[in-house]
A protein has these predicted regions:
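Transmembrane-helix signature of polytopic, membrane-embedded enzymes
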Residues: 2-4, 10, 18, 100-122, ...
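Membrane-interface transmembrane helices that cradle and orient dolichyl/undecaprenyl
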Residues: 8-10, 105-111, 146-161, 266-273
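Short helix- or helix-capping micro-motifs
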Residues: 24-27, 116-124, 168, 172
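Transmembrane-helix motifs of polytopic, lipid-linked glycan transferases
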Residues: 87-107, 145
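Short acidic/glycine- and proline-prone juxtamembrane loop motifs at membrane-interface regions
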Residues: 125-139
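Transmembrane-lumen/periplasm boundary regions of multi-pass, lipid-linked membrane glycan transferases
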Residues: 181-277, 284, 288-293, 299
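Membrane-proximal, lumen/periplasm-facing interface regions of secretory-pathway glyco-
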Residues: 303, 327-386, 395-411, 416-423, ...
Length: 494
């Protein structure tokens, strides 16, 4: 009888692994295919990350450097087409699902691990994120690796502390939100102390050593990245806004899917009362959600800012759904998310190039279109009227033209009269210090004339348009300029 029970357990374990591998391989291949076929232009942030990848550094204005290193690696392998810039995204999400499986298996059992990994892999947020590249992608990968390493270190010690330190350090080099992991770790030690003090110090020392180059870079640049991160929170203009809070809560339901959200909420309410692993996992969920819920109430918060909560959240949600009194709960929740993921892929492929299907305000893809068209027109002007550098007025146009104005990377400088540094281009290039014999100005018509007057020679060439959707386009005036004479002395803008 005992051998029969073991055989049944092994059979269930093997079947579970087959389900997981099928989901991992099937969804990853599908996402890679959609990625390659996607008609979407690079989003402004993606184009900026690509530009960073051409200029290796230990830090950048708004983010730590790992995203740039990651893109440099993938584009070195497959080239710098849009899908090459985004290639790491579906692959790292698959890796994150693998670590979620390992963490769920270590805390509970293989069945829970498989269920949790499939929950993570099918989250609508992951389905959409797999078609883009962002700092959330490596953050989630290293967060999940750190979670698994911490579980193993608490259970077995030894070299797992080194793995924890490695994951923590690389996570901090991916996104500063990795610091929330330390709060979860502290929560776990207070609720269920098991850590070796020596092991914890080893992990922290490794993490600190890996992160140190970015700290040094920030010190050399006035801690500009930390300043930008704090400004993102916009606490200076804080005020109570219930509408922002409700919008953020709705966005979290959309991020994980309604079924998974209900499973997670049920688990958060009921399981910690009798489940030690659940109490421990809450440390990696609650602080993130509570912080951003509070921020949403007083200043607003982007939907993706709380995404790290859903690594541990996938495990807890899977556990809650599997233990639900209604047995099909897990399958229904995952099935709904699979349909949502397919809808996202279908929308990208079918509507990615259609700029007039939605009213402009309701178009979810409007910021991922039109840049290639603008870049092609600017490239033609550069060929007809040779110019060494492109001058623009804003970060979005600067990032997009660096990628889409050929040959890439186009030498782009942003108009920035003396004043606060607001972006990467303000930090890295001062128009007055850039030696360019000839410039191509790409600017809104109402600003271009005043800017052209600040050069000793200027020639109006024409206008170009960037499709915006809903039969609208943004117009840019094109000038050829020579010899910058300096910014206006009184007015901060032309």
């Amino acid at each position: 009888m005992h051998n029969g029970g073991e055989r049944n357990a092994n059979t269930r374990y093997t079947a579970g692994l087959r389900v997981l591998l099928s989901a991992l391989i099937g969804l990853t291949v599908l996402r890679l295919a959609v990625l390659i076929a996607s008609p979407l232009d690079l989003f402004v942030d993606e184009a900026q990350y690509w530009l960073w990848s051409t200029r290796p550094s230990f830090g950048y204005y708004s983010k730590p450097p790992f995203i740039a290193w990651l893109i440099a690696f993938t584009t070195a392998l497959v080239g710098d087409a849009e899908w090459g810039v985004r290639l790491a995204s579906p692959l790292l999400h698959a890796g994150t699902a693998g670590f979620v499986f390992l963490a769920g298996r270590s805390l509970y059992d293989a069945r829970t691990g498989v269920a949790a990994a499939v929950v993570y892999l099918t989250l609508p947020a992951v389905s959409f994120s797999s078609l883009l590249i962002s700092t959330d992608v490596p953050l989630l990968f290293f967060w999940s690796a750190a979670l698994f390493s911490l579980i193993q270190a608490r259970q077995h010690g030894g070299g797992w502390w080194g793995g924890l330190g490695l994951s923590l350090g690389l996570g901090l080099l991916s996104k500063y939100a990795m610091a929330f992991f330390l709060i979860g770790w502290l929560w776990g030690e207070l609720s269920s102390p098991r850590a070796s003090r020596r092991g914890a110090l080893v992990a922290l020392a490794i993490a600190g050593s890996l992160y140190a180059p970015n700290l040094v870079w920030n010190a050399a640049h006035g801690f500009i990245s930390y300043q930008h991160t704090s400004e993102n929170a916009d606490l200076a203009g804080a005020h109570m806004n219930a509408g922002e809070l409700l919008a953020f809560m709705a966005s979290q339901i959309a991020m994980v899917g309604p079924g998974v959200f209900l499973g997670l909420m049920a688990a958060l309410i009921s399981r910690p009362l009798r489940d030690e692993p659940a109490r421990w996992l809450i440390g990696f969920i609650a602080p993130v959600l509570v912080f951003y819920l509070a921020l949403a109430l007083v200043a607003g918060a982007n939907a993706n800012w709380a995404v790290s909560a859903y690594v541990a959240g996938s495990i807890l949600a899977a556990r809650g759904l599997m233990r639900a009194s209604w047995r099909p709960a897990w399958g229904m929740a995952v099935g709904l998310n699979v349909l949502l993921g397919l809808a996202i892929a279908g929308a990208v492929l079918c509507w990615g190039e259609e700029t007039d299907r939605f009213p402009l305000r309701a178009d979810p893809l409007k910021r991922l279109r039109g840049w290639e068209t603008l870049g092609a027109e600017v490239s033609q002007w550069r060929q007809r009227y040779p110019a060494d550098c492109v001058l623009v007025t804003d970060r979005a146009t600067a990032s997009a033209m660096a990628y889409y104005a050929l040959p890439r990377p186009a030498p782009v400088v942003k108009w920035h009269p003396p004043g606060p540094i607001r972006d990467h281009f303000d930090l890295t290039a001062d128009l007055a210090d850039v030696a360019c014999p000839a410039w191509l100005l790409v600017a809104p018509p109402d600003r271009a004339t005043g800017m052209a007057r600040r050069f000793t020679g200027s020639e109006a060439l024409g206008t170009v348009g960037q499709p915006q959707g809903d039969r609208r386009e943004r117009r840019y005036a094109i000038y050829r300029l020579h010899e910058f004479a300096g910014y206006p002395t009184r007015s901060p803008s032309p």
